[in-house]
Amino acid sequence: MEKPTIILATSNGVGMGHLARASAIALALKEYANPIIVSMAGGIAEIPEFMGIRCEYIPGRDRMWMSREKWDEYLRDRLLALVDETGARVMSFDGVVPYPGVIAAKVSHPKLALVWVRRGLWQKKPQRFVLGLQSQMMDYIVEPGDFARAYDFGPTAERKDAQLTSSVSLFQKDTALSRDEARNVLGLDLNRPAVLVQLGTGDSDVNEKMTAALSGLLGWKDLQVILTKQPLDKDGKSLAPSGLDIRVVRHFPLARVLRAFDASVCATGYNGVHELLPALVPTVFVSNIRGTDDQEARAQWCHDMGFALRANQADLGDITATVKKLQDADVRARLSKKCAELPDPTGGAEIAKILYELAVQEEPIRPSWLRYNQLRIQEHINRGMRHVAYMGLRRLALVYRFINPHIVVQVTRQEPPIWGSQNTAQELHPLIKGEQRFEHLISGASDAYIKRRKEIAEAAYGEKIEIINTKKA
């Protein structure tokens, strides 16, 4: 029997959680299916080269290369084209809010099953109001297990529409490198302590947390401090206090080398918790309270149960003091020993099996266009009455302009996008981050697929109309 193709789509969320889960599922699928990952997250650049999984990057609407409505159509057409090219019968989506383009692709394709990989521990944000409608558009919903699920009191906690699995993680005991092997790969001294720090930078409050955390490491003899990117603010100023030996390393997946570290300081995202704790790394969690993920609840559970230390993310002094506790060898030993009690994160393999079984089943029932349009209306309402009023005024303006048209005096071609099927991080990163539009193709794309993709790009970008004279002749 030919291996079925399964598409794993992810949003461009905060951090790498969505992409890490998709990668873990894809690795488990490789044995008996052909997984393809599509994502709006820039981190997808790392996957093809290091995991041997075919991928496509899709520019998100945050790039502002087209209107929101046009981007929804663009995403739908991109996904449908990929389904037609690969013969995929199942597509999963890992993200808080399934984009209208994702659901429209499902509604438009008679044989495509749509699975929502819906993480729990939501904060009570406006997204919860469309949860019911979104769920009804799915053929199947999977909830990746969370160590801290007992502290989940968010909008998904009481729902009965999802299949709960074990937690999903790229860290697996059997494939992770030993301490010395990992240190050799990263170029670290075998005989000096090493701490991994994974906190974001950007806005001033986030930068202050980074500085506070690094300050807690001062005085640790012979310490190697490992970051995944330079600790700089937007003006290029260092956020690190003097006196630390800081090294920046890039390695994907980082889960493979976590045994290199004596301790860690990390945000309390799904990815960090379900990689660091199974790797038995003593950790201080400093929550990022933005986004939908309830990181504070997860951090509190880890702290209360004795698996990690929680720093008060709103108190810089507490962050420094809590991180300083990691310098105590007894504290580190206690945390590491406690983490050994956690169950193995086998959810990637469990979800892979669910997706495979759906792929070999009869075709799913398609949700109705009526239900889809209900969801679109509810989405606009949830964005606020001001947005609804704006949409109404915009429609009226379009009607008025149809009756009283401008004189168009200049039509210019948009700059053509860069096309390519690059599959190394070195090639992909600058293209994904660049200002010129980038249209990424899966490796081995057919001529028909390339032709269809160019039609989609033309419809999305097309021509730019410049109006000089707004009066009728």
Regions found by a protein language model. Name each.
Residues 327-402:
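C-terminal amphipathic helix plus adjacent low-complexity
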Residues 179-263:
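Donor-nucleotide binding loops and adjacent catalytic segments primarily
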Residues 2-14, 28-78:
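Conserved nucleotide-sugar phosphate-binding/catalytic loop shared by glycosyltransferases and other
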Residues 251-297:
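A donor-sugar binding/catalytic signature common to diverse glycosyltransferases
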Residues 305-310, 314-331:
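C-terminal "capping" alpha-helix adjacent to the active site of nucleotide-linked donor transferases
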Residues 9-21, 204-206, 416-421:
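A short, glycine/small-residue-rich beta-strand->loop->alpha-helix junction that serves as a flexible
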Residues 119, 123-126, 134-201:
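A nucleotide-sugar donor-handling region in carbohydrate enzymes
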